[in-house]
């Protein structure tokens, strides 16, 4: 299972494409269903033993943060920053991941696209924290490791920060992040 994920199966199995197509077609399914659909296609395309399906799906429920993340979040919380997650994930999965990683006391909010029924990079998603907190877009430091998400948040008006852990090349989406960092420790120096 780990070999499959290390070979990029997680990126290959069309999940992002499915979310974007569903958003464009106004045919919403929650992220867990989209994950299942895209994994089912990959199982066929890559001739993977179908009995591995549940094991592969369950890996999403045991994701762990990078080692510096909890301490960085604690530091930001001590500095009185409001911290939130803005994710395509389902509320139940996000809650499960946050609690299982003992991060639930660090976040003020968890925003799921399920609240608006469309996936990022729709501006309706990025608008959720703005509406709830009645703040200006430029007051939000928005971090992501995904260049499409950094571009979406930046295009919306957030101060986008790309977490580029692997020295990747930024996508050509007519947008550049305000900052690029290699891990969350670098964020403390920016705020």
Q: Where are the regions a protein language model picked out?
A:
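Single conserved hydrophobic/aromatic residue that forms the stacking wall/gate
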Residues: 1-13
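Alpha-helical elements of Rossmann-like donor-binding domains used by nucleotide-donor carbohydrate transfer enzymes
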Residues: 10, 37-41, 55, 71, ...
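Glycine-rich active-site loop/strand segments that organize a redox cofactor
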Residues: 16-18
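A metal-dependent, Asp-based hydrolase signature
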Residues: 20-54
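Short, contiguous strand/loop micro-motifs
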Residues: 26, 59-60, 81, 113, ...
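Short, acidic loop-to-helix structural element flanking the phosphoryl-transfer center
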Residues: 32-36, 50-85, 95, 123
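Asp-based, Mg2+/Mn2+-dependent phosphohydrolase catalytic module
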Residues: 74, 86, 90-91, 95-191
């Amino acid at each position: 299972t780990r070999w499959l994920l290390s070979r990029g199966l997680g990126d290959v199995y069309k999940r992002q494409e499915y979310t974007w197509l569903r958003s464009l077609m106004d045919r919403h399914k929650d992220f867990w269903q989209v994950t299942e659909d895209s994994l089912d296609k990959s199982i066929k395309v890559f001739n993977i033993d179908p009995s591995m399906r549940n094991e592969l799906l369950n890996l999403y429920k045991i994701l762990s943060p990078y080692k510096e993340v909890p301490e960085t979040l604690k530091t930001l919380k001590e500095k009185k920053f409001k911290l939130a997650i803005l994710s395509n994930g389902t509320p139940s999965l996000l809650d499960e991941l946050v609690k299982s990683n003992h991060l639930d006391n660090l976040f003020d909010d968890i925003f799921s696209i399920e609240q608006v029924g469309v996936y990022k990079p729709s501006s309706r998603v990025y608008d959720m924290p703005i509406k709830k907190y009645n703040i200006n877009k430029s007051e939000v430091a928005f971090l992501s490791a995904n260049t499409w998400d950094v571009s979406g948040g930046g295009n919306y008006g957030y101060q986008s920060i790309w977490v580029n852990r692997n020295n990747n090349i930024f996508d050509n989406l007519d947008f550049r992040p305000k900052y690029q960092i290699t891990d969350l420790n670098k964020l403390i120096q920016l705020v």
